[in-house]
Amino acid sequence: GYVESGMCKMIAIGIAKHFGCSWFHRQGFDTFGERIPMVAAEFLKNMNVIMGVGVVQNAFDEISEIKAYPKDKIIEGDHELLQIAKRRLPRMKFDNIDVLIIDQIGKNISGEGADPNVTGRGCMPGFEDDFHCKKMFVRKLTPPSHGNACGLCYADVTTRQCLQSVDWESTWINFSTNMMLSAGKIPVYQNTDYEALRLAIRTC
């Protein structure tokens, strides 16, 4: 869409918290591109907002751009920062690989645990157009995710240790809010990293 996971999404979904998130997801992911800027524009028109500050990170998780926009330029600025963010996304060296090993996933990295623009796996079709892996192995969750396992469903293999670190209550709340119970699926798990990696390789 014109804007994605930036200032407009924070306004349209984030400020309304659980209610806003539930309402948006009930409309369907395919409506996000149209609805997010529309709802953000309505909010900005009716609320006392001074400005918006957008932050872009690079492929090394470092802040690479900070820009402030006046109220009437926030949506336009969000689109501008989206183009910058896309240019600075991390890229795989190969377009097609057998096994992708992800050390950690978490909500602090991406709403889907790992950025689907990088991994090629997400809730919407199209991410696999630029990168494809036959099997994905997720080792663990990030500490800041506090056990929220959102995104683990995209993995083919994980470990028992990873599943034992999951806070199932917060994870189920996340899935029920976004109306995607399929996102709660659990990948095949093994007792150790070695066994998980061996299984991923053997089943390519």
Label each region the model flagged.
Residues 117-121, 125-204:
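C-terminal non-catalytic interaction/assembly regions of soluble proteins
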Residues 110:
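Hard-cation-handling environments
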Residues 2-106, 129-131:
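Conserved, well-structured core segments that form the ligand-binding/active-site neighborhood
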